[in-house]
């Protein structure tokens, strides 16, 4: 099972990624984790990546693809792997294809932006403990206060509506085109000797268990 998980920020990809990893016994490939591990290990690619990171620059796609290929050679990837948050752009998807990185499925978790804004902007956090609430779905006993300590809850900057909207705008511009990219490739079939992935789209609305069952059904 070699899989790319797509969906907007707040669509619930992280939760479903954990279920998929456990069911199929595959690792989640995070480019952030890979970069940190390569830098820490001092590999040639890691040293090169560190130069860009220290200068505050984006690590080039070619270098990230090099790290991906190294990571996929490790024994835990023998049964497959799950990409979450990569590729983010058409250029990265093209680079993966050119590098011969095989993908069986592209699974999109679809949630309307209005729902994501409500989900994320309604979150409230107790800073000292990390306990989280939601003004609609999981409200505290006393509005605006932690259930245990009674201390005030805050809204993190990341959860503010204007921040959520900006993240969704970036997703719309950069990552959403991948849905068309993989959907079109699935229809065209094999390219450059690389089998086209099957494209699946599921609704991310409902309970966590309902969405999990949809995901598993889509990957049969």
Swiss-Prot record:
AMP binds at residues 31, 36, 57-59, 85-88, 92, 156, 167. It is found in: Cytoplasm. Keywords: ATP-binding, Cytoplasm, Kinase, Nucleotide biosynthesis, Nucleotide-binding, Transferase. One of its GO terms (cellular component) is cytoplasm. ATP binds at residues 10-15, 123, 132-133, 206. Residues 122-159 are annotated as: LID. One of its GO terms (molecular function) is adenylate kinase activity. The keyword Kinase applies. The keyword Cytoplasm applies. It is an enzyme of class 2 (transferase). Pathway: Purine metabolism; AMP biosynthesis via salvage pathway; AMP from ADP: step 1/1. PROSITE patterns: ADENYLATE_KINASE. Its EC number is 2.7.4.3. One of its GO terms (biological process) is AMP salvage. Pfam families: ADK, ADK_lid. Residues 30-59 are annotated as: NMP. It catalyses: AMP + ATP = 2 ADP. Consists of three domains, a large central CORE domain and two small peripheral domains, NMPbind and LID, which undergo movements during catalysis. The LID domain closes over the site of phosphoryl transfer upon ATP binding. Assembling and dissambling the active center during each catalytic cycle provides an effective means to prevent ATP hydrolysis. Belongs to the adenylate kinase family. HAMAP family: Adenylate_kinase_Adk. NCBIfam families: adk, PRK00279.1-1, PRK00279.1-2, PRK00279.1-3, PRK14527.1. Monomer. Catalyzes the reversible transfer of the terminal phosphate group between ATP and AMP. Plays an important role in cellular energy homeostasis and in adenine nucleotide metabolism. This is Adenylate kinase. The lineage of its organism: Bacteria, Pseudomonadati, Pseudomonadota, Betaproteobacteria, Burkholderiales.
């Amino acid at each position: 099972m070699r899989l790319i998980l797509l969906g907007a920020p707040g669509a619930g990809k992280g939760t479903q990624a954990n279920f998929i990893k456990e069911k199929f016994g595959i690792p989640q490939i995070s480019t952030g984790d890979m970069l940190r591990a390569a830098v820490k290990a001092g590999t040639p690619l890691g040293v090169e990546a560190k130069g860009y990171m220290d200068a505050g620059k984006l690590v080039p796609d070619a270098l990230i693809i090099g790290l991906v290929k190294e990571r996929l050679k490790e024994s835990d990837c023998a049964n497959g792997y799950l990409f979450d948050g990569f590729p983010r752009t058409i250029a990265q998807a093209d680079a993966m294809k050119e590098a011969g990185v095989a993908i069986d499925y592209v699974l999109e978790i679809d949630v309307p932006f209005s729902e994501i804004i409500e989900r994320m902007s309604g979150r409230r956090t107790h800073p000292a403990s990390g306990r989280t609430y939601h003004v609609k779905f999981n409200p505290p006993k006393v509005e605006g206060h932690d259930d245990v300590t009674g201390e005030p809850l805050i809204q993190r900057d990341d959860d503010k509506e204007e921040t959520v909207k900006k993240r969704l705008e970036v997703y719309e511009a950069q990552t959403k085109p991948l849905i068309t990219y993989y959907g079109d490739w699935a229809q065209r079939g094999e390219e450059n000797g690389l089998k086209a992935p099957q494209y699946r789209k599921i609704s991310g609305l409902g309970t966590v268990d309902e969405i999990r069952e949809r995901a598993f059904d889509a990957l049969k």
